[in-house]
Structure formats: C-alpha cells, structure tokens
Amino acid sequence: MDSLFAWIETTSVARATANSLALTAALSAIHLLGFTLVMGSALLANLKRLGALLPQCSVAEVLRPANRAILVGLAISVTTGALLFAARATAVSANGTFQLKMLLLLTAAAFHFAVGRNDYVQRPGVAPWARAGAAVSLSLWFALAVTACAFILLE
C-alpha cells in the first residue's frame, strides 16, 4: 500500500495541492463546509427521529431533504478530502486518528442511511426502536466530529 500512496503523492493533482498554500486553504475550507452540511443535516434528521424537533412535520418531510443534504455534504467532503489526502497520502494513511475518522465516516453514513430507509419513515409518530437508532446514529456522527477535530489539531 505504501507504494500506492507514494505514487498518489507524485500525481499532478497532489503536487499542485502540496505546492499551493492557497489551494490547500481553499480545499480545507470547502471540506469543512461540506462537513458542516453533513453534521447539521444529520443532527436535524436524528433529532426528528428522536421526536425532539419539528413536531408539526412528519419524519419523512424532514428526512428526505436532510438525507439529500447529507449526500451533497458527503460528496463535497469526500472530493475535497481526496484532494487534500493526495498531497500527503503516505503520512496521512499511517495516522491512526485519520484511520479512525474514515472508519467512523463509513459506519455513521452506512448506519444513518440503513436506519433511514426503514418503513417507519412513512408512519406517523416515532417508534421506540427508531429513537434508539437515532441515538446510535447521533453518537456515531458526533464521534466522527470529535475525531475529525482531533485529526486537525493533532496532525
């Protein structure tokens, strides 16, 4: 794998990112905007699943746009994250905090969309098991947020 990561660092995209502070800053800012969209939408969706937000709206009315926003935020963050990763692929891939961040990202997204696709979305009210799923989902998203912050601060 190290040879793959070393090769990634030699690509023109990786070199351009590594050699431009302005490009790195712009990509980082856009990456954080995408992450903010993901986290805000996940918070909104899961608070609704918990029954703690927007009682006048059905779960489906809240989850549909929130899930779309999560997907847009993920697309933004994954794209910019890949560009940022390319510049330092070898070092970043060996970083345990980064590895945990990627594991939590995959787990949180998979869990969120697996739970969000269930049929309770179409029923009125919030089922008790849906509340439990929302609590787990929120925990995963917040663990991701803390780990992402740790990666930024400790890197």
Where do the PLM segments sit?
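Polytopic transmembrane helical bundles with strong interfacial aromatic enrichment
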Residues: 1-155
